[in-house]
Amino acid sequence: MGVPSFFRWLSRKYPKIISPVLEEYPVIEDGVQLPLDYSSANPNGELDNLYLDMNGIVHPCSHPENKPPPETEDEMLLAVFEYTNRVLNMARPRKVLMIAVDGVAPRAKMNQQRARRFRSARDAKLQNEAREQVLREREDYGETIDENVKSKKTWDSNAITPGTPFMDKLATALRYWTSFKLATDPGWKNLQIIISDATVPGEGEHKIMNFIRSQRADTQYNPNTTHCIYGLDADLIFLGLATHEPHFKILREDVFANNNYKKPKPQDMINLSEEEKQQLIQQDSEKPFLWLHISVLREYLSAELAIPHLSFQFDFERAIDDWVFMCFFCGNDFLPHLPCLDVRENSIDILVDIWKTVLPKTKTYLTCDGTLNLEPVEALLEQLGDRETDLFKKKYIQEVRKQEAHDRRKKLKSNPNVSQGKVDRNFMIPLENMPVYDVDGNAAEGSLNLSNKDFANMRKEINLANEGDGEAAKALKLKSEKNSGVVEFSSEELKNSVQLSKTANYDAATSLQEKLIAKKMAMRDEENAEELSLKRKSEDVDSAEKETSNEPEDDEADYDEDEGSTVPPAVIHTGIVKSGFIDTDESVRLYEPGYHDRYYQHKFHVPAKDIPALQKDVIRCYVEGISWVLLYYYQGCASWTWYYPYHYAPFAQDFKNIKNLDIHFDLGEPFLPYEQLMSVLPAASGHALPEIFRPLMSDPNSEIIDFYPEEFPVDMNGKKMAWQGIALLPFIDETRLLKTVREQYSKLSDSEKARNVRKKDALLISNKNVNYDLFMKNLYGENPVNVIEFRHFKSGLSGFVTQAEEGFELNSKLICPINGGGLPDLSTNLFLKLSYTQPVVAGRCKSLVLNGYIPPQPMLTPQDRDCIIYKYSNRWNPSMMKYNIVPVGPSGITQYQPRVGGYRSFFFHKEQTAYAQQPQQNREYMHSQQRQPQGSRYQQSRYNNGNYNNSNNGYSDNNNGNTGKYNRHYNNSRGNSNRYSNSNDRRREFRR
């Protein structure tokens, strides 16, 4: 998601939310690597459901940054299997595994995808040119380059888009690999696998959200289900909070540890030896992972968002929703962030402070179950607008100070003889570097008269002479004497030679200077961060975090917050350009009076007289945008066709009279895969489309040729890194595009038409699953039915299944679609593949914690809470994370009553309550007469083991001084009770 450095900022502000992954490694016996036992206990704590945002795996496997890229697509898919298997061995889900691949996105997301893919194509072109330049230079030095190496091009990552042949192959490969694991790994026998590939519309992470909401709607749903989502997107944190599932965590690569790895340059990847390749692959496979615990983040937010002496009842769940909503103003995938806000500048803290003053006055929250309350939103933005001018000035002053500090450090580093104030080092010049000349300026007697070329060509003789070899010394002396011969030149020849020498020296110096400058600029951010860390400066020069992809800070790029070049681009500050980098902030000057009108004139290109009308439209569109984003996170996609039609956001001070706006959306329908490809791909990536569409992107006479510019400007918008710029691409005219594209559908082949469809999710189970016999009997028996509904209690999954859309046949073979890897064909009797439909959610999803929830073990101490409440400075060190171990799952006694018809984990609640109220002398008799659960209808709670269900560590009598803290948060007007008990014998059985 488009919130650069959000994860880094959050983990520094709330350090206990992250903990290291305890990873087991395969054992090698007699040179054979034995696989891990998936069924063994998980050292990280047991997990029910794991969700994989698959684009965060496919991108780094297909075009890795720290190792040579795979040679073929089959090698890419094998790398995907290996990476996925590693993630699964860390998490070890026991009930559900959902693999979600990005499908066709809403139109609001396509604008960002379009900008990314156009820039990706241009970056690939520059990378190929740089690679060819390196190869030419190596050939000039006499190195022989293989023709296969010379002809190789960078793999186009834009192929990771729904509708391409690669995505079709990926879906087939994932279905095969999961079937292979179900058939061969005993630890997977009870695992239910849902695969939502690119033919299912929707972004991967939001498919996962829809699934969780649908499961919560089942009355048999266990409110203590433990969830984990793997992905590199920053918005997964918001999604985890938006589920209101407290037993939720996020698995991701450790970006702090990844900063310690040196990123190889493209030229370093050419002609690597096999040993060097294996070394890089080994280094990449050892990258550590970490957990981000939503339960601990909720604890921090309970302290952060607490407002004493409110005149109405505080609802912690709605306060969390307000916090998530305020974070959207700092950046998201669908709207530009407000100009005055930046995560690195603690803008979220500013919004929280304002929210704490607005809430007591308005006596209502900003949001309710995903719907905006515009009156308090306007009050929030009004107060932010009052601070806006001061924020711009403060930001400018900080930037000037940072630049001055950087210039000082640069001067000290380039000239070590300049005094630094403590010890005068002006006279400390290394004498050994002085040339050996006599007083007349001639070479000293006995010195060798050799040129640089001679030294390079006679390196061997020099080394031997230094070791006492007389023959080598003699050869050097002869060469020196030969160079000492006197040659007579005319005055004109001398004059010309001097001029040529000056020119050559100037060219060489210029070339060297350019290389040095480029090198210093590339190293500048790294050096700054290191020096500031050592000196513990208060000014935090924080490079944007790498969540991704390399951020992708989001989907495909979403795994890479720091994608793109780290070298500041050459920026054009004046004039109107059609390509290259520009910076409109130079002319806007937000820190000077009059910036308001200059902002709209230079960024929106309107005259002063049209600013009021434009401003009104921009404000309305932006309010629609934040309403759409909030609904998207909490209820699902409100409209497939809506999008924000501007490249820039308005000022906070301009949000006036928005409470009367009537905001509504038309649902529409998603694009087909080829329609999205034509919307987001540049002409350079036309190879990923059927051939019939390619002329539409390149033919000058095409009706839609204006959608595919080869050159386009990038506005740096006051930023320094190339990836932070805004690509100023034309917006797609949906009507014109769809009309032109759909006219070509009749010319597609059958195989091409098969990739341009919408499908359902696939469900795969092993032949040992508890539902296998039920599904086989009713779908493939003598009297088959069309649809089977199954509930949550039996297997931890609910929904509807039908026979597989893509002809799954019993008693047949599933052919391995990948060459290499030694993977066999599979018998279809070992597993079952079905089409899966999620339960229908009736009405709106409510923002609350479900009854029957057992809180996890509290992790914060009173000191931790005080640090948040009183804003103490936090000198956090990422190396301390290894000591932070967070218990997983529920702990203690619930304060909720069971709901009628719901999950019956507390079936004996009434009987146990009656037992607790009996006189002491009657209890022994009653206890001896209690019926003990027997047979398959009863199952002991898996939470009654170890410390995960020990009442001594429970809610009411924990030792960290936080007794009763959940009382005020969860005893709210939604009907949740705060009753709880200290009995050690509670919750001993779950009854089916």
Curated annotation (Swiss-Prot):
Highest taxon above the source species: Eukaryota
UniProt keywords, alphabetically: Exonuclease, Hydrolase, mRNA processing, Nuclease, Nucleus, rRNA processing, Transcription, Transcription regulation, Transcription termination
Any one cellular-component term (Gene Ontology): nucleus
Main location: nucleus
Cellular localization per UniProt: Nucleus
Keyword Transferase among UniProt keywords: no
Biased composition (Acidic residues): 550-564
Ranges for region Disordered: 528-568, 916-992
Residue ranges with Basic and acidic residues bias: 528-549
Subunit structure: Interacts with RAI1; the interaction is direct, stabilizes RAT1 protein structure and may stimulate its exoribonuclease activity. The interaction also stimulates RAI1 pyrophosphohydrolase activity, probably by recruiting it to mRNA substrates.
Family: Belongs to the 5'-3' exonuclease family. XRN2/RAT1 subfamily.
Protein name from the UniProt record: 5'-3' exoribonuclease 2
The species this protein was found in: Kluyveromyces lactis (strain ATCC 8585 / CBS 2359 / DSM 70799 / NBRC 1267 / NRRL Y-1140 / WM37) (Yeast)
Phylogenetic placement of the source organism: Eukaryota, Fungi, Dikarya, Ascomycota, Saccharomycotina
